[in-house]
Curated annotation (Swiss-Prot):
It comes from Debaryomyces hansenii (strain ATCC 36239 / CBS 767 / BCRC 21394 / JCM 1990 / NBRC 0083 / IGC 2968). Pfam families: HTH_9, POLR3C_WHD, RNA_pol_Rpc82, RPC3_helical. This is DNA-directed RNA polymerase III subunit RPC3. It comes from the Eukaryota. GO terms for cellular component: RNA polymerase III complex. DNA-dependent RNA polymerase catalyzes the transcription of DNA into RNA using the four ribonucleoside triphosphates as substrates. Specific core component of RNA polymerase III which synthesizes small RNAs, such as 5S rRNA and tRNAs. Belongs to the RNA polymerase beta chain family. Residues 533-554 are annotated as: Leucine-zipper. GO terms for biological process: termination of RNA polymerase III transcription; transcription initiation at RNA polymerase III promoter; tRNA transcription by RNA polymerase III. The gene is RPC82.
Length: 606
């Protein structure tokens, strides 16, 4: 076979580059070629795929089976021509992209055995419960595995696999829509637009029912000897949507930590984890269907309607008592809320306080984040050791009492960024859609401030507030020299963070009479950053693979059974040095890759 991954895989788009590199790293050269071809040409038959990729048909078919198993490829059989078409599915490769973080999180949360189960499922794509347990002979081990599988499934980390999971969502929608439209009769009293919209609404209902079918308790579980377990015939796979919700929880927690403080962010993290499983998906099925929702206003209204429905159903609503039950034992919130109402010094009989003497030396009380922003007027003759704070409104006897947690929730709901919304007294919900805008904005601003400097950061913030401005206006507003402003504008333009608009003052558009305005558009700026991060991730993976290929002979030698464990005795000093450098280089690159991936996740789905 002479086929190689085409150069277009790297140049076509940043996503194409990343997905092809991931496929090559985890699944091999042939899988990368097939993925690249399907991204370039769209859906193809096996024969067309073989012709365009120059891979033998037999090898194409065997590779397609593995890729379908791993959810990297979807297939669709046309009813009229009976041909089977294959199309690219990013879900499988995204699981490979996050596999390390997925396994690490499951290990920390559920233990090593649960992490092993998730790792096995990721490796094979999906599996039947009875097939997974049939090779285990010890009944006690089988019982433990069944309990772990039930726990992971109940918490949403595993999901049921159905036929619709292997079919392209566009083809599935189109088939249902055409059937519904055909069964919706034309009428002289109903316009064609109304008829089409009516058919769309009916199709949405059918499509939702199709995706949610097969999830009844009778089909998923069975009770044997009074013990509940998953049905042996159930086919399960890892649920990527559940992990994306977990990453969103981490992003929101980090934002709260940066804006409010560590202890409040811990309380917020508990609140987010409480409703995480039932929170709205980051990738809703309707938004993946081409041409269904094109208007940004309509898309925003649709996303908000989903969130509002979850609030109405009480799925993303919690109260203070719920948090008290799940608060970690090592979380100590005592004396974390310091205000005028909570710091009233009581009368101390050992030393009288003269109320007639004016206060000349006010004491400062440090808050959790170290800011001296609260001033309490205390008598200078009263030492700090003799103060007895009467906490009338907060209970400091317990590390996380109801009143303490409630005050932290008040902090989260009353700030500039609405981390929480108080529906009724003591009952809260999380405005996910609005908060993700703040997450992107704050991380973007921080990135500019740390990489380009304070002047660029000030300039961009000024431009955001002014919407549209020229150099002179910007210089006067942020109090910088025009030369400095010009230099910073040049840096921002090179990174596509701002746009330039030419404004001619004469009909002939003479350059001497032309001036320029600047603006910042979030969508284009975020899009450029996202593509840059995506390309960098692919480039790092390619570099790791490249220096492994450059030292292929040495690495193959180390993999030999007689060499493993005896490297220091059997390898030359130069080979040991090269091996150590390779290891350090790979560790550094993987660390860089994970840091970039953290930003990539924030700006994904912007």
């Amino acid at each position: 076979m002479n086929a190689v991954v085409p150069d277009s895989a790297k140049t076509q788009s940043a996503k194409s580059n990343l997905y092809t590199t991931l496929a090559k790293t985890h699944l091999g050269e042939v899988a990368a070629i097939i993925v690249s071809t399907l991204i370039s040409y769209g859906r193809l038959t096996a024969k067309d795929l073989s012709n365009k990729s120059e891979v033998p048909l037999k090898l194409v078919k065997s590779t397609l089976v593995s890729l379908i198993q791993l959810s990297c490829i979807s297939y669709w059989k046309e009813e009229s021509s009976k041909q089977v078409f294959y199309s690219f599915n990013e879900n499988g490769l995204l699981i490979f992209l996050h596999s390390g973080d997925i396994i690490n999180h499951i290990k920390l949360t559920y233990g090593d055995e649960s992490a092993g189960i998730i790792q096995n499922i990721i490796e094979v794509g999906h599996m039947k419960i009875e097939d997974y347990l049939q090779n285990i002979e010890d009944p006690e081990v089988v019982f433990n595995k069944e309990n772990l599988l039930l726990k992971l499934f109940s918490d949403g980390w595993l999901s049921r696999v159905q036929m619709s999971n292997f079919q392209p969502i566009d083809d599935l929608w189109n088939q249902l829509y055409q059937e519904t439209l055909k069964n919706t009769p034309r009428s002289t009293t109903i316009s064609e637009i109304k008829r089409v919209n009516e058919a769309k609404d009916k199709t949405k209902l059918k499509f939702t029912n199709l995706l949610e079918s097969g999830n009844s308790a009778k089909e998923l579980f069975q009770i044997e000897n009074g013990i509940k377990k998953l049905a042996p015939s159930l086919v399960i796979a890892f649920n990527l949507s559940r992990f994306e919700k977990h990453r969103r929880t981490e992003q929101l927690t980090n934002l709260a930590k940066a804006r409010i403080g560590i202890l409040t962010s811990k309380v917020y993290e508990c609140a987010l984890q409480l409703i995480e499983q039932h929170s709205p998906d980051l990738r809703h099925s309707f938004l993946k269907i081409s041409g269904l929702i094109n208007d940004p206003v309509e898309e925003q209204a649709f996303v908000n309607s989903i969130e509002n429905q979850l609030v109405d159903d009480k799925k993303i609503v919690f109260n203070v008592k719920d948090l008290v039950k799940i608060a970690p034992k090592d979380l100590d919130l005592r004396n974390s809320i310091l205000t005028h109402n909570f710091l009233k010094p009581t009368f101390n009989p050992k030393k009288r306080v003269n109320d007639d003497i004016p206060d000349t030396n006010p004491k400062k009380i440090k808050t959790e984040d170290g800011m001296n922003n609260l001033m309490i007027d205390l008598d200078p003759d009263v030492s700090e050791n003799n103060l007895d704070f009467d906490m009338h409104n907060t209970d400091n006897s317990e590390p996380h009492s109801v009143s303490l947690i409630n005050h932290h929730l008040k902090l989260l709901s009353s700030g500039v960024i609405p981390f929480l919304i108080e529906i009724t007294p003591g009952t809260y919900t999380v405005p996910y859609t609005d908060l993700m805008k703040y997450v992107k904005q704050c991380n973007y601003d921080t990135l500019i401030k740390t990489t380009l400097g304070l002047d660029s950061f000030r300039l961009l913030r000024c431009l955001k507030s002014l919407k549209l401005a020229d150099e002179k206006t910007l210089a006067n507003t942020i109090l910088l020299k025009e030369k400095t402003v010009r230099n910073e504008l040049f840096k921002l333009m090179n990174l596509n963070m701002i746009e330039i608009q030419e404004v001619p003052r004469s009909a002939d558009r003479a350059a001497s009479k032309t001036f320029y305005l600047f603006r910042h558009k979030e969508f284009s700026a975020y899009n450029f950053l996202y593509n840059s991060l995506t390309f960098c991730m692919a480039d790092i993976l390619s570099n790791i693979q490249q220096f492994k290929n450059d030292n292929k002979i040495l690495l193959e030698k180390c993999e030999r059974e007689d060499v493993k464990g005896n490297e220091e005795e059997l390898l030359l000093e130069s080979e040991l040095k090269t091996l150590k450098n390779l290891q350090l280089r790979e560790i550094n690159n993987i660390g860089k890759f994970n840091r970039i991936k953290t930003l990539y996740e924030i700006f994904d789905n912007f």
